[in-house]
Amino acid sequence: MNNILSEEVLNVTDFTTSRQLTLWKREDLQSSQLDDVAEEVPVALVYNGISHVVMMASPKDLTHFAMGFSLSEGIIDSPREIYGMDVVPSCNGLEVQIDLSSRRFMGLKARRRALAGRTGCGVCGVEQLNDIGKPVQPLPFSQTFNLGNLDRALKHLNDFQPTGKLTGCTHAAAWVMPSGELAGGHEDVGRHVALDKLLGRRATEGEEWRQGAALVSSRASYEMVQKSAMCGVEILFAVSAATTLAVEVAERCNLTLVGFCKPGRATIYTHPQRLIAD
């Protein structure tokens, strides 16, 4: 198999489709024109030849997605437990074929579940409600962040949404350095998928990605908190609100959860001791 950081095999340079649409504007007649629509395709994650999950996603950065999903769902503990990946077309979408260590594959088969293919849906396929909000090892308090640097990150978050700028249809997730600069980011039609792409990228980057926080352009659901905590992220910033279950999970696993992030303001839901306010 190819190295896990190899380029996707598909020659995809444009992740939108032009369609003839009808527009309506007040006091104007309807007009027809071409406009961009974001691509959304079924993506199957196939471990050692067995399909584990199908998600609806944007068809880019899929090896990062597969790595992040594997980590945030507890399929692996380390990127070293994945030996290689290939992205290949299938009859109805795309497959990420993952070469998983034998030990991890045995564990995966023991708890295998099939998730229905909704856009970034995290509850689909969970067999019992008790499986939601599974226990996460409490995070250490090793990170701090100066809220005065958050404005810089918010200003540049859209830089990682080129498809979103064309279509208004994607979510973004970016890694914020302590200085407020963005080390990198990813977008997707599904907010959970965008976060998984970021978490997968972070797992394969160097030490400069150890310090900082995750920033998402969406609301913060319980699953986004849980995924972040599973990958050792101590601080999660969200542009929109957090749900009650997200707050409960964040409190329980020692994650600092911040919502309604706007220039000059934010709402701190849990564990404010990591944050510095100048």
Curated annotation (Swiss-Prot):
The active site is at C121 (cysteine persulfide intermediate). One of its GO terms (molecular function) is sulfur carrier activity. It is found in: Cytoplasm. Its main location: cytoplasm. Gene3D superfamilies: 3.10.20.10, Cytidine Deaminase, domain 2 (3.40.140.10). GO terms for biological process: Mo-molybdopterin cofactor biosynthetic process. Keywords: Cytoplasm, Molybdenum cofactor biosynthesis. GO terms for cellular component: cytoplasm. It holds the Pfam family FdhD-NarQ. Mo-bis(molybdopterin guanine dinucleotide) binds at F260, C261, K262, P263, G264, R265. Belongs to the FdhD family. Required for formate dehydrogenase (FDH) activity. Acts as a sulfur carrier protein that transfers sulfur from IscS to the molybdenum cofactor prior to its insertion into FDH. This is Sulfur carrier protein FdhD. It comes from Salmonella heidelberg (strain SL476).
